[in-house]
């Protein structure tokens, strides 16, 4: 299944706020309507919608998300918590959380077009897994700097998560540590996502 490229508002009306997909929010009252509908949903649909929230927020294909679930299942600790850590530490998501890109698809485009360096080297793989002490900078080209600066100027990001530090003047971000689950950028029940996949096998 390919990455979603359809209408974004349609998705957030059904699934709720997906800040990684679009900076636009849901309409007033939509959360109440979703809660009203939730009484009529089957357990399968509830798990499916949580999975879809995760997939669309992080901009993943079905195959990519399934691969992350398998990796998380083999790691120590809670599968759901590890899954969120893996997704949050992707380079495209880190750029988004730093405010260097308006959305995760926007961050992915920056990486694909080779505007971003990690530890002084160009990285053009959006799924690159960032590690503690990684330094993320903009390529030393005027176009790259202007793109990032424009994104940062228009950013509506709230408090920066504790695992990141941003030097906005130098367009530089630092990964301090692996993200703590309470700083994940999406309201999600990750256990339902794990249950969804466990019931597919």
Curated annotation (Swiss-Prot):
Localization, UniProt: Plastid, Chloroplast
PROSITE patterns (alphabetical): RIBOSOMAL_S4 (PS00632), S4 (PS50889)
GO BP annotations listed: ribosomal small subunit biogenesis; translation
Keywords annotated in UniProt: Chloroplast, Plastid, Ribonucleoprotein, Ribosomal protein, RNA-binding, rRNA-binding
Residue ranges occupied by any S4 RNA-binding domain in the UniProt entry: 89-150
Main location: plastid
SMART domains found in the cross-reference section: Ribosomal_S4, S4
InterPro entries documented for this protein: Ribosomal_uS4 (IPR022801), Ribosomal_uS4_bac-type (IPR005709), Ribosomal_uS4_CS (IPR018079), Ribosomal_uS4_N (IPR001912), S4_RNA-bd (IPR002942), S4_RNA-bd_sf (IPR036986)
UniProt family annotation: Belongs to the universal ribosomal protein uS4 family.
Family annotation (NCBIfam families): PRK05327.1 (NF003717), rpsD_bact (TIGR01017)
Protein name: Small ribosomal subunit protein uS4c
Taxonomy of the source species: Eukaryota, Viridiplantae, Streptophyta, Embryophyta, Tracheophyta
């Amino acid at each position: 299944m390919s990455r979603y490229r359809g209408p974004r508002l349609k998705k957030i009306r059904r699934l709720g706020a997906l800040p990684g997909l679009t900076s636009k929010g849901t309409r007033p009252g939509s959360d109440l309507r979703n809660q009203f509908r939730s009484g009529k949903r089957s357990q399968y649909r509830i798990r499916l919608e949580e999975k879809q929230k995760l997939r669309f927020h992080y901009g993943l294909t079905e195959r990519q998300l399934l691969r992350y679930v398998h990796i998380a299942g083999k790691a120590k600790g809670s599968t759901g918590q590890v899954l969120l850590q893996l997704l949050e530490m992707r380079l495209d998501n880190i750029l988004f959380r730093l405010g260097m890109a308006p959305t995760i698809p926007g961050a992915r485009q920056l990486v694909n077009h080779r505007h971003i360096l990690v530890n002084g080297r160009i990285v053009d793989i959006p799924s690159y897994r960032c590690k503690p002490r990684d330094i993320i900078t903009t390529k030393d080209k005027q176009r790259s700097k202007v793109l990032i600066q424009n994104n940062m100027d228009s950013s509506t990001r709230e408090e920066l998560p504790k695992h990141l530090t941003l030097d906005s003047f130098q367009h530089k971000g630092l990964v301090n540590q692996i993200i703590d689950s309470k700083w994940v950028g999406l309201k999600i029940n990750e256990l339902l996502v794990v249950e969804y996949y466990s019931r597919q096998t």
